[in-house]
A protein has these predicted regions:
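Glycine/charged-rich beta-loop-alpha catalytic/anionic-binding loops adjacent to active sites
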Residues: 2-12, 132-140, 187-194
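Ligand-binding beta-strand-loop-alpha-helix segment within the catalytic cores
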Residues: 2-120
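Conserved mixed alpha/beta catalytic, RNA-binding, or beta-rich assembly cores of soluble enzyme
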Residues: 3, 104, 119-166, 174
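Generic secondary-structure boundary/loop-capping signal
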Residues: 7, 93, 102, 111, ...
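Short, surface-exposed, polar/charged, turn-prone segments marking secondary-structure boundaries
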Residues: 11-14, 70-75, 147-152, 190-194
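Short acidic, glycine/serine/threonine-rich loops at helix termini
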Residues: 53-60, 132-135, 173-178
């Protein structure tokens, strides 16, 4: 790390991440479809997601991100106005706000691509968080939970099914508690309960 290093704003980091992961997914999905004799266009939509500036998450950041920092680096980040949390035995990490998604800015483009029978990759990483200001959009220093944005996209596209891919074997409720439980397939009513 260079002393003159300037970190990019969170919204720019989200856009960059969405772009490079979307590019990779798009190419790999396209190749797999071609290998199976399926000729469909695969498109990645750089996606902004509107969040509420008064969402309680902006007042209580909880989403841990970035690498572990030592005490000196953590103090420098605090001086820059960033929120830092200590993880005992591991070091310090930055925490940011994780507001709920309100709406997807590019939803009409996503729907048009779906209507054109394209494979669409959208809302990567939860989307680029933006605030609406008199019909203008401004990037927000936050991240959006991917699962919540996936649900919002399913809702706004009238999806018949929502499948969330994860690297964990099962989704859990009451994680870390005595009543922790693995979930497999669940109904909408069960999901609303949790």
């Amino acid at each position: 790390q260079h002393e003159d290093y300037t970190a990019a704003p969170m919204c720019i980091c989200s856009a960059m991440s969405q772009g490079y992961i979307g590019y990779d997914l798009q190419n790999n999905i396209r190749e797999e479809l071609l290998n199976r004799g399926i000729f469909r266009t695969v498109s990645t939509v750089l996606t902004s997601v509107v969040v509420d500036p008064y969402d309680e998450a902006f007042y209580t950041p909880t989403k841990v991100l970035g690498r572990y920092l030592n005490a000196e680096e953590a103090n420098l980040e605090r001086k820059k106005g960033n929120y830092i949390v200590e993880e005992p035995g591991k070091g310090f990490r930055r925490i940011v706000s994780a507001p709920n998604p309100v709406s997807i800015v590019e939803i009409d483009a996503i729907k048009a691509l779906l209507d054109a029978d394209q494979v669409v990759i959208a809302c990567g990483g939860g989307g680029i968080p933006v605030l609406e200001q008199d019909n203008h959009l401004k990037g927000a220093s936050a991240v959006i939970e991917k699962d919540l944005t996936a649900g919002k996209m399913a809702e706004e596209t009238d999806a018949d099914m929502l499948i969330i891919l994860t690297s964990v074997e099962k989704v859990k409720i009451h994680m870390g508690r005595a009543d922790e439980k693995d979930l497999g397939e669940i109904t909408v009513d069960q999901a609303k309960k949790y």
